[in-house]
Amino acid sequence: MNFAFYMLMPTMPVYLVEELGISTSEVGMVLSSYTIGLLCVRPFSGYLVDCFSRKPLYVFAFTIFACLFAGYWFAMTVYTIMAVRFIQGGFMGLTSVSGNTITIDVIPSKRRGEGMGFYGLTINLAMSLAPLVAVGLYDRHGFFWIIGVALVIALVGIGSVGLIRYPKREKVPRPAFSLDRFILVKALPAALAYLLVAIPYGMLLSFVVLYGKEIEVPDPGYFFIFMAIVVVTARLISGRLVDHGKIHV
């Protein structure tokens, strides 16, 4: 899922500017529509995960998310691309929350730090390697090839969900619908800290390839190679440090 998504993140701005002639301000609107869709769904995702069977919900959201990649083949204006990204962002929010919850459920509690470290590693690897693959595909075959490859990868990801041995959960009463189910006040400081880190990172990842082409860097993909090396090293070390009490969270 993440690999498919991050293939579009650095290459879509280049496609919009070079092939559709869209201004950089409009590019920002297109990119932000995805985040807006995600934010509209995220507050309700936890409630849905608690109310319904998690694995079927995960498969449903993942399937819609994957199929929406095909929408980019037909979206040729700013507003149609924004619409596809908005809807896909919403299903990305539901897919990520249900996937994270399932991951926590299946990891043994004694190895949760290490397990989540490896889970996070796969996400970070996708963030680092998918743009590298996408840049190579874009230079050789164009943006529509990226869409096709991303769609296939996402569909393979759906198939791999069947390999997850998810324990049966006892039926519990559905939680009452209330505002505090969607906003966890205690989590706001951590959310703010992550937001302050994610904003500059998202800006960098979205426009680094476009900037590299503007200053005529021969291969902007090297940026992602070095980032992948650092991410893998940090993730492999940090999970074990948390489990052994060396890092307190």
Annotate each predicted stretch with a short phrase.
Residues 84-121:
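Cytoplasmic helix-loop-helix junction between adjacent transmembrane helices
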